Amino acid sequence: RAHTGKNKVIRLQGHFHGWHDHMTSGFNSHHDGTPTRGVLPSVAESVILVPPNDIDCIHERMSSDSDIAALILEPTGSTFGMVPLVDGYLSALRELTERYGVLLIFDEVVTGFRVAKGGAQAHYGVMPDLTTLAKILAGGLPGAAVVGSREILAALDFDAMVAAGEEKIQHQGTFNAYPISAVAGSTALSIIEASDVNERANASGAFLRQGMNQVLHRMRIPWVAYGEFSVVHLFTNPDNRVIDPSSFDPLKIPWQELKRNSSHAVTKLRLAMLANGVEFNGFPGGTISGAHSEADLIFTIEAFEESLNMLQSENEI
């Protein structure tokens, strides 16, 4: 907003960007843009929510509203690809944002340095104006960064703003320039740069998804493990679709349905997985590390099968 002099932000329904006031509506509730509890209506009104993968809707919004400062999204799709984006979507966004003078922001808090050494933007070949980074950035310690063009980031530079006669953007923070996180992050990024950790983690993701789907097929459970890179998403099929894991295409499922997993079954599955020695994320699924060995992955697949057996024995699935 400071750079463009505009006020509004476009966001995609279902995409997560933290829980500050401008980002609470539209992730898992209030998809109509109304404010969540405690958020001022005037704040919610400055955010435009649009459905994912609808480039025409974004075009219409940008062409009819000259007060849009930025568009922010997760470049792999909501929740690290739980709701993937169609091919060419990011390139189309880049073209539209440049045409209408809107900044393009990638939220790579999860995907940065994970999808590829250069993050999702390097993998897809689309360069945003700003990118948010965290998690891997600080080597597992508290730490985050906003990166982007020198022209935009100059608003954070004391000397540049004094020279320009403009007010500097405030950005105080508890962990700003925190040396321990900086050392951990620098070390972690050096390891990533010099190794094949990305490729190994991505290959492990494919191995785990395949193994889980083999279990589901063998047990005749109409669920599917899917995803890309080093993540596995588990679709628990809330509407009881006929599913073939070998041909499952999440783009053919409404995004709301992909995110509407059975909370009861997922809770029971997570408890069963814990009982069998594996922490399973609640989205549901998980991310794979380059440190995970083949033995770890096989152990996870076996724990998954035993956990499903436990749920079946209790008539939970």
Region spans (language model):
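Conserved N-terminal phosphate-binding loop of PLP-dependent enzymes in the Aspartate aminotransferase
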Residues: 1-317
